[in-house]
Amino acid sequence: MKHLLALLLAFTLWFNFAPSASADDFANLTPCSENPAYLAKSKNFLNTTNDPNSGKIRAERYASALCGPEGYPHLIVDGRFTHAGDFLIPSILFLYIAGWIGWVGRSYLIEIRESKNPEMQEVVINVPLAIKKMLGGFLWPLAAVGEYTSGKLVMKDSEIPTSPR
């Protein structure tokens, strides 16, 4: 019975019932500056900051994007460098900042591990030490590669405690 269900699952996944996704090279998207639905909506953009022209400025920025028939700008996330500013650059920047925060937190925890009261320093942050770690954390990709190649980044299996359960 197991083999029959496994075969049925393999057959279902191999010949799945969903049609394959296909992008028609943005055939249904038009520049927002030429899209009538977007042009109608852009007249009603609200000012979201103290700047009285913030709605107009935002409409001008979105005008260079591609809009669908409903008049909303669409993100193009297919990896083409012509649309790198839409998704690729912000996502790489997000990953860099998230890695920086993680690396700084890791190095802070490693440093306070040797102090006389590490649990308390996790609760009450040692601000001078944290700032020192934050300022040095911008080169975290190079430091991570250096620690990985030296073997300090990954612990041996024998050094990892396991629960007796």
From Swiss-Prot:
The keyword Signal applies. Coiled coil: none annotated. It comes from the Bacteria. Keywords: Photosynthesis, Photosystem I, Signal. Gene3D superfamilies: Photosystem I PsaF, reaction centre subunit III. InterPro entries: PSI_PsaF, PSI_PsaF_sf. GO terms for cellular component: photosystem I; photosystem I reaction center; plasma membrane. Disulfide bonds: none annotated. SUPFAM superfamilies: Subunit III of photosystem I reaction centre, PsaF (SSF81536). Transmembrane segments: none annotated. One of its GO terms (biological process) is photosynthesis. Residues 1-23 form the signal peptide. Belongs to the PsaF family. Probably participates in efficiency of electron transfer from plastocyanin to P700 (or cytochrome c553 in algae and cyanobacteria). This plastocyanin-docking protein contributes to the specific association of plastocyanin to PSI. PANTHER family: PHOTOSYSTEM I REACTION CENTER SUBUNIT III, CHLOROPLASTIC. This is Photosystem I reaction center subunit III. It comes from Synechocystis sp. (strain ATCC 27184 / PCC 6803 / Kazusa).
